[in-house]
């Protein structure tokens, strides 16, 4: 028993060491391609729904200086009638298409949900709807007591209509916002804050969301078969080494350690078996990006309609973030892993086939991370151009987030060798494009995340984080980045031997009993 425990500990240390080594900062790391959140129309729920599991972390991570939180009950008729009023105001401040983005976070909490009872009591909620105003960090770190003087969190006592709520906010901020304010004079204009590097931090939440949803789809839709099992292993290995989220790297490592237990080589799942497997993965705390993910909503990738952007946007951001975090020696294997993953597990048939055709058209192996990053960027633009035409003909696109050639000239003038575009073809300066991706989706995406959201969510894991940090420090040596994946790959050979031995021990114990 003691030997088995030691062996398991050693294996986990090896996997985490590989992930820590491979995830060590590189000068050309962490960039992606994507778009910012934009809730859009009133019925698109501009306000962000929060609950007790993510309330503190989300508000602590908020970049806005102010927040309004509505506490309501879903069964309350007055709350249902009030929702359109609250959404009208939320539409002004939340998201890329907002008239006044980056000023106020508009959120909601359902106090009728059992998980939120203590949270609502913490803020002395005694009627519905109940609105509070204050700095997001104060919501995250304190409670509200109506008897307490000089409280930075204030009760909004006159916000029963959209007009009255906005008037209260205007009085508080000494502003003159109007419900008629619009973000764009032209719907194709680039948002004023699109080049703000502070906005990119929210992309990391959607990378986690896309990662968790991808695994959920694999389990629920029984897409894993014996023939594509290895491609999932290879993709998880990339996530262990290169995922921009530390929690997702750790979760991927845990899944790989227990891979044979959950997905045997002859596994073929029925729908019921897939649901049971999803439950078993959750019960054993193998949530790939944390137990509160998927959260069920998008930030950076939120569209103005419920059916636009979202998962596909998040998946693109994930793939781009992987390609720019690898070492040169990993470029070809990463390319193969991404292509195989989309081919085997992306369930949009037309998109899957089209992407794999572009993968198959590559004639020479990739030699550098730069080559792979630019190929994926070019591929993404080709997909956008194809979808732009289809969505225009069918009227199915997102009116506030039309497909565009990326990056637009407003964001990266140096990316264009000439301001003239001939027959839709752009004369790109690829060196500038790559540098743009490095700068726009670089260290800010990960560093801001670590300083805010991650710190809050991982308070309960201080011991684990401390051990992981020690491993990372011990493993930080000037070795080529490819060694990270090499170590991870070798580790899984040891894992297989270890788990086979453990399974034999389990059978013996059963016989003994």
From Swiss-Prot:
Superkingdom is Eukaryota
Classification via PROSITE patterns: ERV_ALR (PS51324), THIOREDOXIN_1 (PS00194), THIOREDOXIN_2 (PS51352)
Q: Where is the ERV/ALR sulfhydryl oxidase domain?
A: 304-406
Q: Would the keyword Nuclease be found if you checked this record's keyword annotation? A: no
Give the binding site residues for FAD: 309, 316, 320, 350, 354, 377-384, 403, 406
Q: What biological function has been recorded for the protein in this entry?
A: Catalyzes the oxidation of sulfhydryl groups in peptide and protein thiols to disulfides with the reduction of oxygen to hydrogen peroxide. May contribute to disulfide bond formation in a variety of secreted proteins.
The name this protein carries in UniProt is Sulfhydryl oxidase 1
Source species of the chain: Oryza sativa subsp. japonica
């Amino acid at each position: 028993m003691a030997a088995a425990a030691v062996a398991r500990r050693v294996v986990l240390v090896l996997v985490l060491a590989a992930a820590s080594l491979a995830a060590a900062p590189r000068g050309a790391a962490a960039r992606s391609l994507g778009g910012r959140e934009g809730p859009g129309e009133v019925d698109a729920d501009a306000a962000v729904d929060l609950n007790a599991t993510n309330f503190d972390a989300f508000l602590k991570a908020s970049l806005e200086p102010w927040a309004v939180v509505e506490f309501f009950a879903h069964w309350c008729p007055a709350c249902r009638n009030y929702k359109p009023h609250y959404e009208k105001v939320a539409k002004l401040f939340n998201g890329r298409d907002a008239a006044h983005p980056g000023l106020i976070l508009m959120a909601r909490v359902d106090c009728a949900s059992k998980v939120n009872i203590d949270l609502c009591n913490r803020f002395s909620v005694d009627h519905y709807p109940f609105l509070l105003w204050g700095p997001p960090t104060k919501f995250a770190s304190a409670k509200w007591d109506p008897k307490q003087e000089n409280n930075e969190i204030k009760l909004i006592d006159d916000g029963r209509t959209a007009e009255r709520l906005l008037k209260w906010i205007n009085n508080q901020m000494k502003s003159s916002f109007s419900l008629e304010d619009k973000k764009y004079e032209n719907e194709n204009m680039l948002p004023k804050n699109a080049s703000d590097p502070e906005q990119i931090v929210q992309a990391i939440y959607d990378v986690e969301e896309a990662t968790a949803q991808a695994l959920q789809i694999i389990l629920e839709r029984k897409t894993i078969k014996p023939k594509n099992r290895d491609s999932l292993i290879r993709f998880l290995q990339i996530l262990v080494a290169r995922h921009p989220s530390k929690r997702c790297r750790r979760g991927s490592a845990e899944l790989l350690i227990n891979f044979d237990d959950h997905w045997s080589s002859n596994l073929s799942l029925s729908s019921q078996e897939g649901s049971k497997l999803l439950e078993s993965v959750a019960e054993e705390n193998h949530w790939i990006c944390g137990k509160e993910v998927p959260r069920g909503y998008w930030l950076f990738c939120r569209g103005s309609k419920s059916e636009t952007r979202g998962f596909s946007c998040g998946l693109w951001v994930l793939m781009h973030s992987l390609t720019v975090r690898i070492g040169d020696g990993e470029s070809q294997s990463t390319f193969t892993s991404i292509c195989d993953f989309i081919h085997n597990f992306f369930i949009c048939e037309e998109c899957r086939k089209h992407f794999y055709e572009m993968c198959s058209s590559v004639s020479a192996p990739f030699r550098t991370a730069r080559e792979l990053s630019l190929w994926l960027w070019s591929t993404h633009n080709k997909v956008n151009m194809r979808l732009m035409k289809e969505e225009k003909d069918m009227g199915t696109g997102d009116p506030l987030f039309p497909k565009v050639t990326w990056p637009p000239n407003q964001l990266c003038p140096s990316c264009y060798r000439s301001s003239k575009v001939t027959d839709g073809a752009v004369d790109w300066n690829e060196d500038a494009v790559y540098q743009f991706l490095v700068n726009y989706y670089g260290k800010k995406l990960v560093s801001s995340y670590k300083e805010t959201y991650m710190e809050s969510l991982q308070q309960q894991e201080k011991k684990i984080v401390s051990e992981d940090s020690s491993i990372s420090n011990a493993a930080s040596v000037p070795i080529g980045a490819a060694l990270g994946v090499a170590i991870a790959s070798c580790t899984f050979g040891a894992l297989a031997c270890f788990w086979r031995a453990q399974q034999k021990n389990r059978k013996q114990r059963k016989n003994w009993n």
